[in-house]
């Protein structure tokens, strides 16, 4: 997600009165311009996202929160911690990964994730495989394509899709279609934040969910209460 939002009332409470229950996970930064909530992970307090209330538009949904994941994507220390959290999911389940396909500026996080996936663990004490990291290229229609020299990293490979945020899953579905088209198999989906639990039968391995952002809602574009209430759009976001 990349967005800039206008001001929201400083006393806006996105949790509908549930702030006390979530107190240990919420931090609040308020200024004249905006209110930003910092949400930390239960598993590692150094890993966090930001949530900003408002009216935001993605490619498939209207949202009442903007989820900021920049620190996890671009801060080295936080990225490493987040990668360890995401990798543990695959270690615990014995899921082997050949290629990490990074969507929406997650290449740095993807590199750390690949490093963690290659490390020895209890289920695989002597790993001998290489995990590749790949960023997508798009054609004029927005489909993911792979040049001849990179197709070998997808064809016949077990692919992990990495993305910052998932709202409806449409972006991941398109990526899965591209992986399948080039002869690969999507065996894992990892996200910093996801509002859904699975896409086309593949469970989403996520650090944060919609439950971590009390009051979070994603609406169909044709049935958005924010639009019906004439609330202006603050920004357009990815995902």
Regions found by a protein language model. Name each.
Residues 1, 11-12:
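Intrinsic-disorder-associated, low-complexity terminal segments enriched in Asp/Asn/His/Tyr and depleted
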Residues 21-25:
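Polybasic, lysine-rich low-complexity intrinsically disordered segments
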Residues 26, 31-40, 174-239:
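PRPP-dependent phosphoribosyltransferase catalytic core
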Residues 26-96, 239:
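Active-site-facing substrate-recognition patch
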Residues 95-106:
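Short glycine-rich phosphate-binding loop at a beta-alpha junction
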Residues 102, 161-162:
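Hydrophobic Val/Ile/Leu positions in short beta-strands of Rossmann-like dinucleotide-binding domains
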Residues 107-160, 167-170, 221:
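Short, glycine/charge-rich flexible loops or terminal/linker lids adjacent to PRPP-binding catalytic cores
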